[in-house]
């Protein structure tokens, strides 16, 4: 039995899309952070950056600076989110501690939660509009990237071949975590303790 997949897809080249009049672009995350920090410094009367850093669409607040200035963590976070939402490339700017009550669609909220690890990822997640890269690029750029929730990145191959696998395909949504559950169903054994997927029924029906 052979199972093959990929960890991500790839975005269409934004310059090519723009040539065909399809909205696309690049987001200056560091610039957005700098602008937000300038406004936060004025609002709270502090010297230094209340947003400490950004990585992979997450913004990290400076807890030490907030505590040193006796500021409210929640007030600073809310103000940072308000400033970041002013960015024209912002589709959603989310407080990860309270994402369960956000106004994001359920499927997108679930994916954002899957990317969140308290203490390691940032407190604020910035989600750009579709086909917006997370950096600026020139008119001669011909590459691509990934790390988006959109179908061009999230739609990836998943192939089962060999023992007990018949010919077929499915348009039913599946996830990488479904692989373990499906293999266990083929073997008629218990799923692993940490398995959170479900068996891919169309594949089992082809056996």
Region roles according to the model:
Residues 9-11, 122, 162, 188, ...:
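Glycine-centered flexibility sites
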Residues 109, 142, 197:
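Conserved glycosyltransferase catalytic-site signature
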Residues 1-132:
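Secreted, luminal/periplasmic, and some membrane-associated catalytic domains
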Residues 27-73, 143-187, 201-206:
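Substrate-binding rim/cap in mid-to-C-terminal beta-strand-loop elements of soluble/periplasmic
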Residues 137-143:
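Conserved alpha/beta core surface patches that mediate binding of polyanionic ligands
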Residues 133-137, 167-168:
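Short, solvent-exposed loop/turn elements at domain surfaces
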Residues 101, 113-117, 124, 170-173, ...:
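Cysteine endopeptidase catalytic domains of the caspase/legumain-like
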Residues 81, 85-89, 184-192, 205:
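Sec-exported extracytoplasmic/periplasmic mature domains
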């Amino acid at each position: 039995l052979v199972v093959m997949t990929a960890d991500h897809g790839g975005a269409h080249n934004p310059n090519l899309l723009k040539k065909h009049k399809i909205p696309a672009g690049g987001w200056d995350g560091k610039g957005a952070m700098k602008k937000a920090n300038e406004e936060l410094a004025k609002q709270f009367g502090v010297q230094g950056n209340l947003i400490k850093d950004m990585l992979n669409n997450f913004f990290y607040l400076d807890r030490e600076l907030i505590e040193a200035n006796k500021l409210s963590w929640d007030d600073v976070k809310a103000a940072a989110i308000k400033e970041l939402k002013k960015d024209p490339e912002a589709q959603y700017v989310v407080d990860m501690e309270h994402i369960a009550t956000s106004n994001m669609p359920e499927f997108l909220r679930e994916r954002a939660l899957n990317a969140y690890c308290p203490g390691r990822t940032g407190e604020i997640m910035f989600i750009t509009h579709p086909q917006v890269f997370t950096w600026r690029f020139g008119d001669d750029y011909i590459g691509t990237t990934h790390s988006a929730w959109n179908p061009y990145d999230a739609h990836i191959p998943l192939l089962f071949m060999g023992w007990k696998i018949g010919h077929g395909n499915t348009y039913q949504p599946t996830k990488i975590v479904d692989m373990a559950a499906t293999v266990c169903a083929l073997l008629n054994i218990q799923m692993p303790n940490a398995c959170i997927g479900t068996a891919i029924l169309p594949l089992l029906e082809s056996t």
